[in-house]
Amino acid sequence: WGDGNPEGVRQRAAEEMKNTARAARRFFNAAPPEIKQQLTRIVVNGFTGSSIWQYLYAFPPTPPDLIERGFQDFATRWKPILDVFEQEDVYFALEVHPTEIAFDIVTAERAIEAVNGHPRFGFNYDPSHLGYQGVDYVAFIRRFRDRIFHMHVKDVWWSSVPRLSGVFGGHLNFGDSRRYWDFRSPGRGCINFEEIIRALNEIGYRGPLSVEWEDNGMDREHGAREACQFVRQLDFEPSRLSFEAAFER
């Protein structure tokens, strides 16, 4: 695999991803029937990496063809991986995240285009990586309604007034009071989870509401209990009847 050689390591990582799809299929096949019935699809969450992650901030000016080559490189490496996911009837969900090939709505659309709309490529929806950037995180759900394969209930706080550091964090550790934004226990940040649940119900999402918890200012065990209670209170089934239909005899 050319250990120590970057390209050899990339090839080994690609094979690892293919084997992950195969393993996910085998885990599903071995699961009890009651577990299988709860799953709408088999999903592997993860990151794709990006050969252009260092150009997140477009200065010095970044030539458009350099960015295009980055998306082409992503497609060249990931289409064969996604083909194995298709063979195994498994879906790959990229967590849209700064320094990944997709980090907002525009780059998520471009990533889909790069792999020619591959049916096994979609997203692990995590609003905490979108809100503080200024991205419309509820619109993301509706925009990619057929590609939301998984989601994280993860909250983030961002300031309503200027701070000593900005979106890029000022090289400050998480939990530092000088930050412009920071992760919070679900329900204690700025994310509007009410609108998220309504949008997920609207698109027919039936997957898990998976808590990813980070909060430097809170005890973890307290946070785990609180997050569980928050999600149970938050979630609800969509209406099966329109408002107008309720008046029909």
Question: Which ranges hold each PLM region?
Answer:
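A short, acidic, amphipathic alpha-helical segment used as a generic capping/interface helix at domain edges
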Residues: 188-202
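Acidic/histidine-rich catalytic cores of soluble enzymes
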Residues: 68-190, 239, 243, 247
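Active-site acidic/histidine proton-transfer and metal-coordination neighborhood
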Residues: 1-123, 221
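C-terminal helical cap(s) of enzyme catalytic domains, especially alpha/beta-barrels
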Residues: 220-240, 247
